Amino acid sequence: MAPRVGCFLLAVLISASCKVVTSSDPMCTEKEANKTYNCENLGLREIPDTLPNTTEFLEFGFNFLPAIQNITFSRLINLIFLDLTRCQINWVHEDTFQNHHQLNTIVLTGNPLIFMAETSLTGPKLLKHLFLTQTGISSLEFIPVHNLENLESLHLGSNCISSINLPENFPTRNLKVLDFQNNAIHYISSKDINALEQATNLSLNFNGNDIKGIEPGAFNSKIFQSLKFGGSLNLSVILKGLQNSTIQSLWLGTFEDTDDQDLTSATFEGLCDMAVESINLQKHHFDGFSPSTFRCFTGLQELDLTAAHLKGLPSGIEGMNSLKKLVLNANSFDQLCQINAASFPSLTDLYVKGNRKKLDLGARCLEKLENLQKLDLSHSDIEASDCCNLQLKNLPHLQYLNLSYNEPLGLEDQAFKECPWLELLDLAFTHLRVKASQSPFQNLHLLRVLNLSHCLLDTSNRHLLEGLLDLRHLNVQGNHFQDGSISKTNLFQTVSSLEILILSSCDLLSIDQQAFHGLGKMSHLDLSHNSLTGDSMDALSPLKGIYLNLAANNIRIIPFHLLPTLSQQSTINLSHNPLDCTCSNIHFITWYKENLHKLEGSEETVCANPPPLRGVKLSDVKLSCGMTGMGIFFLVVFVFLLIILLIFSVKFLLRWKYQHI
């Protein structure tokens, strides 16, 4: 009985008082101290006084500024980037930016502009990017040309522009991007294009304009970085109009809501009279698909046929020896051999991602592509009981292989023997059935990145990763370990070169203290979304200077002796843990406040206990863990009772001895 009473009294003695320190958040969100701020959608009618004069990047969209003038932003003379999207601006007055010499980007997207003064853009010495998208402009004469000599990109999409005839003396010498997408442009004249002749390597965007005619010779001898005519109904008109031009990238794809014509061999005749490196024909339909369709494609280096409703490429295609990149995503091949890869012997990049049918890898379908370096077969319902040497035969230079999001794959010993130069292998969300006791990856000595997330791995196989001598990045997210624990002897012991290890969502309950020994090169460890407690941090003691993510675990209390382990890390995330904000955790809370510069996710690092502090940020909590006045009173009473008890005990003992003499 006496011990119980003593414990009760001691519990009362060591009582704690809790205090929450709150701070009012600034109206604008600070992204980088004294430089970058977001003031979007706050109903502001002026620049708030809380914004420092040193602000350089300001996102001020979705507020209310019907007119802007030279006093609107006069205080913020260091502005470099200004976003005024959808601020209901109607008027841009004279010299609005006259004191903003460093300003290089102005975003006026979504403002119903009525008037822009001729000198409204004067002031910035290096204005490079101007966004006038969705501003109701119907003529390019509306744009003030003064002080646009250094302009590199002009965005005029989603307006009512019907002619691209630029104003006289419009400076184009430094122009790199001119965006006219989703306007009402139907005809392009030689005069329109000649006005752009000073611009070199220009990117022109006409997506969403139904171009019905191009004046013959308009693009003659012109050189472009890229041209986009997406959504045009008649590609023959486009290609004939581009004769004798040189284009690095030509985008001729269409969209879901566009009712375009089927493409035939005749459609591409104009392509024979121009020099193009890359063409995109996504979502088109082909009529009479045959080798002759590709007659004018011989100079291409890149071809994108995404979602082109293809069931196969015709055999016998000739002259495409220059093609380096082929994109066949979202088509309907039954077998990989149906792409007739032998027609493209110089391919280095091949994408057959998101095939709409179950794709059979076949055997030796790609063996003629001995120069292939990058292969993406993800999201294609691929299933193979014995992968992958026969399927990837004669691909000795392959460096990147993506087989993620497929059906179960059976991996034999040295499953990637045909691809010894692999540097990145992605098998995420593909159930792997490792048949051999040895590693299926053991010949991949150059592999640097391996994604095995959600692969239903047998993590008890300590040999699984053997042979990966240069592995830097390993993702095993979503796999499970026996009894929810990483033991002393585990599959990571054979990959001492690891720098990044992802172990999130693995249902981990504990980690052995020796689990990460030998991983001295580690710089990033993600243990988030598990069920680890504070005691599991003993396993982290060998790791120093790492990014450590412990978010969304079951950490309540972090013992005092583990704080040095946390202190030796560079960045730590402890958000979304049920942290105890009582005196039993006082050492950690004190450490936390002293190391805020190391902590990530502090807004979501909150108390779970006691109930009065639930949801309060850890950095806002103050604990007084000394004795209160009530505690002192009980201490005096306890000591007094203890003395009386001691006196009576001594007196009783002496009387007992006296009676037994």
Regions found by a protein language model. Give the residues of each.
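Extracellular leucine-rich repeat
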Residues: A2-I661
